[in-house]
From Swiss-Prot:
Mn(2+) 2 binds at K270, D275, D293, E354. It comes from Shigella dysenteriae serotype 1 (strain Sd197). Keywords: Aminopeptidase, Cytoplasm, Hydrolase, Manganese, Metal-binding, Protease. This is Probable cytosol aminopeptidase. Binds 2 manganese ions per subunit. Belongs to the peptidase M17 family.
Length: 503
């Protein structure tokens, strides 16, 4: 699908369709008023007859409006004008894309980007429109033999901006939006792949392909079990012992800043390509969704793709911690004591708390990069789902400025996160009689004690932890990976690179 920006009046558009907004109660947006004036009150007459109230999600498709060059005008209900916020704006864009696609409009000029969204500029509105459009049209049908496609799918979308001065920021918004959307799609595709295809070797192959596609700035190294053993990553290795698939750690290095003192930002993604729970096996109901336990790695992969596509002037390292947690004769057990790469020992009380056992060794491994900051992304705890539900990602950090940066990026991108505490009193729940710590701390504050566990391996750098257990995928009829938190991390890195979205 092709996107572009232009600045022009609606009466001069020869597009197949013009999209304009209508507010409650039957109030035309400024652009719709212009079209109404040109058409000698044709549109307002329809509204007076009760054809459209302007409620969110309502649509009315008009054909051959008098004195208008475009074949059709699509009126979209936007709710009450003063209540048009970020969430409602994206819902309006989503409804627009679906309606255009369903009605066979192959191209359209959209004036919704001229609507006032409180606290948001034209760059934000255009970029969010691009990201929302790509999200709306996403489907995962690679494994289906009968692929359903619209007869006349939407192919071209033009977003209008008020003045020519805003064309440059609009074009940049499209560039950024397309790169972020491509990263989200890549993460979703990986997450939706079945575990018999997407194992650690598959993740490694995708990481290598990324380096091949962006060979100027990207290098990928894959570390196998033998090298992990030599490095002392016994905790990581223990988790994968029960699986016939080899554990593989893929390290993707992007260099966008050649300065010697430019330290990298490291992103670590939990990549459990299937989590049965191991010996502490999960209930069978919903176990198929444990293919999504690698969504942290998928998100990191998507972010690395975005960074490489935009050639951001920052150094970023992405680590995909690929592994599979299966029961078997060689599987690790409750009661085992593992020696981590850091030298600290861990008593295993539950083999289904495996993500932290993989991550702790990776968090030690990345010390060698002398990072500016480390952010791990993991579907880590069901407790985070209980705490925050499926709308907001859990955030913990040992460095307040880093946490504030991530929260700000989450608000900018609409990919929201909420900070949880890492108090010393929670650390006491991890005490063990037989090792330096246990791998679980009981039910109270489970998301926080998991973060506390990881914090013991991050004392040498600034670190943040994103628990995406509630936000990485949807269940039910709309089951599928969401691609979160690619947008959040993309915004964080854009901000670091100086592209903060200000016009």
């Amino acid at each position: 699908m092709e996107f572009s920006v232009k600045s022009g009046s609606p009466e001069k558009q020869r597009s197949a369709c013009i999209v304009v907004g209508v507010f409650e109660p039957r109030r035309l947006s400024p652009i719709a008023e212009q079209l109404d004036k040109i058409s000698d009150g044709y549109i307002s007459a329809l509204l007076r007859r009760g054809e459209l109230e302007g409620k969110p999600g309502q649509t009315l498709l008009l054909h051959h409006v008098p004195n208008v060059l475009s074949e059709r005008i699509l009126l979209i209900g936007c709710g009450k004008e003063r209540e048009l916020d970020e969430r409602q704006y994206k819902q309006v864009i989503q409804k627009t894309i679906n309606t255009l696609n369903d009605t066979g409009s192959m191209e359209a000029v959209c004036f919704l980007t001229e609507l006032h969204v409180k606290g948001r500029n034209n760059y934000w509105k255009v970029r969010q429109a691009v990201e929302t459009a790509k999200e709306t049209l996403y489907s995962f049908d690679q494994l289906k033999t009968n692929k359903s496609e619209p007869r006349r799918p939407l192919r071209k979308m033009v977003f209008n901006v008020p003045t020519r001065r805003e064309l440059t920021s609009g074009e940049r918004a499209i560039q950024h939006g397309l790169a972020i959307a491509a990263g989200i799609k890549a993460a979703k595709d990986l997450g939706n792949m079945p575990p018999n295809i997407c194992n650690a070797a598959y993740l490694a192959s995708q990481a290598r392909q990324l380096a091949d596609s962006y060979s100027k700035n990207v290098i990928t190294r894959v570390i196998g079990e033998q090298q992990m053993k030599e490095l002392g990553m016994h905790s990581y290795l223990a988790v994968g012992q029960g699986s016939q698939n080899e554990s593989l750690m893929s390290v993707i290095e992007y260099k966008g800043n050649a300065s010697e003192d430019a330290r990298p930002i490291v992103l670590v993604g939990k990549g459990l390509t299937f989590d049965s729970g191991g010996i502490s096996i999960k209930p069978s109901e919903g176990m198929d969704e444990m293919k999504y336990d690698m969504c942290g790695a998928a998100a990191v992969y998507g972010v690395m793709r975005m960074v490489a596509e935009l050639q951001l002037p920052v150094n970023v390292i992405g680590v995909l911690a690929g592994c599979e947690n299966m029961p078997g004769g060689r599987a690790y057990r409750p009661g085992d004591v593992l020696t981590t790469m850091s030298g600290q020992t861990v008593e295993v009380l539950n083999t289904d708390a495996e993500g932290r056992l993989v991550l702790c060794d990776v968090l030690t491994y990345v010390e060698r990069f002398e990072p500016e900051a480390v952010i791990d992304v993991a579907t880590l705890t069901g407790a985070c789902v209980i705490a925050l539900g499926h709308h907001i990602t859990g955030l913990m950090a040992n460095h307040n400025p880093l946490a504030h940066e991530l929260i700000a990026a989450s608000e900018q991108s609409g990919d929201r996160a909420w900070r949880l505490p890492l108090g010393d009193e929670y650390q006491e729940q991890l005490e063990s009689n037989f090792a330096d710590m246990a791998n679980i701390g009981g039910r109270p504050g489970g998301a926080i004690t998991a973060g506390c566990f990881l914090s013991r391996f991050t004392r040498k750098y600034n670190w943040a932890h994103l628990d995406i257990a509630g936000t990485a995928w949807r269940s039910g009829k709309a089951k599928g990976a969401t691609g979160r938190p690619v947008a959040l991390l993309a915004q964080f890195l854009l901000n670091r690179a100086g592209f903060n979205g200000e016009e």
